[in-house]
Amino acid sequence: MKALVEYLNHKKLIFKSLQEILPKELGSRKKVSLYVGVDLKGYYALVMQLEKKSRVLRKEAGDLMALHEKLEKYVGSSITKKYILIKAPLCSHAKAMLEENGWKVWHEPE
């Protein structure tokens, strides 16, 4: 988590609080790290971290957006800012789909 906080500071994002939520709590078996934080203006933000060897396709991007909706119900509040850090090969259609739906995508190919 320390590496993630340093990465977010590098991107000029500072949170008052940042807590990890396990995908298992949302009924998901995805290998993804979920962090919900409150920024300095008081808005909820979601930071997803995804690391894998295979390509992230458009179908999986849809699954990640569905996970965001489940997380909003779990937290009981609207999450306005959505960030995703992907350390895997990324399909251009999946990236476009995420960006169209308000996600800020940081892609670091391995």
Regions found by a protein language model. Give the residues of each.
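Acidic-basic catalytic patches of nuclease active cores, encompassing PD-(D/E)XK
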Residues: 1-34
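Sparse, context-dependent recognition of short Cys/His-centered cofactor- or disulfide-binding micro-motifs
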Residues: 3, 19, 33, 49, ...
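Conserved catalytic cores of phosphodiester-cleaving nucleases, focusing on short active-site segments
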Residues: 22, 26-27, 33-71
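Short, compact, well-ordered microdomains
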Residues: 77-110
